């Protein structure tokens, strides 16, 4: 978008969209970790992995909905020429949180672990798979009783060399 539209227009739209995405995440008990190259990285903490996955899925569906509204109803001022889109990835499991870099805990707060690695690898594939929302196999297993889950494809990942099934969630 930055190549076709003014940086100011894109930045203004992204900041507005980011606020909407953050609100959706927080509405379902999540926390935003960081924003990397247009990606919002969020996490949910707790002991009930199934319940946490459900909250994350609800947030993802809400983000998908507000993004459609944002694009379709003119909040993105170039909506007639270019649809504002986002891709969403859900990956769950145990990770670490804490400060990285800097001395004495003065670094940046972040999350680390297999679920994060999986999410970043899947994020690179979402558009190629023709989907807007991809759910990692282990997360889909946590969601299958609460959502309509459809298998997309099995993909090889660095941390899943034998492959991992991917799914999407129906609206």
Label each region the model flagged:
Residues 1-22, 26, 33-34:
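Conserved long alpha-helical elements within nucleotide-processing catalytic cores of c-di-GMP signaling
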Residues 54-65:
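Amphipathic alpha-helical segments that line or abut small-molecule/effector binding pockets
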Residues 95, 119, 127-171:
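Cytosolic regulatory/linker segments at or just downstream of nucleotide-handling modules
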Residues 24-55, 69-114, 142:
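Catalytic core of nucleotidyl cyclases, primarily class III adenylyl/guanylyl cyclases
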Residues 3-4, 101-103, 147:
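Short amphipathic alpha-helical segments
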Residues 10, 17, 36, 52, ...:
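Helical mechanochemical/support elements of P-loop NTPase systems and associated helical scaffolds
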